[in-house]
């Protein structure tokens, strides 16, 4: 279920501050964050944000299509490598 529009978007204050500083200084350095729950806002377009996936920070370039999504959607936490190949020897 989507968040109500009357509530507005959620973004952690420390991340919002880092985004404001990066926009003002036109910094190209990735912004490290552990806040996967924060929503992507229009101010973030063009920034690279390194989102923590539980093990490492995954760099993600924010584009216009990502607005309204959560940061965590773009840094997968699980790596599926497929099922093991069964031994094909006859029984």
From Swiss-Prot:
Matches recorded under SUPFAM superfamilies: Ribosomal protein S19 (SSF54570)
CC per GO annotation: cytoplasm; small ribosomal subunit
GO molecular function terms attached to this record: rRNA binding; structural constituent of ribosome
Domain of life: Bacteria
GO-annotated biological processes: ribosomal small subunit assembly; translation
Keyword list, A-Z: Ribonucleoprotein, Ribosomal protein, RNA-binding, rRNA-binding
Metal-binding in keyword set: no
Functional description taken from the UniProt entry: Protein S19 forms a complex with S13 that binds strongly to the 16S ribosomal RNA.
Entry-linked HAMAP family: Ribosomal_uS19
Family: Belongs to the universal ribosomal protein uS19 family.
PANTHER family per UniProt: RIBOSOMAL PROTEIN S19P FAMILY MEMBER (PTHR11880), SMALL RIBOSOMAL SUBUNIT PROTEIN US19M (PTHR11880:SF8)
Protein name, as recorded: Small ribosomal subunit protein uS19
Provenance organism: Dichelobacter nodosus (strain VCS1703A)
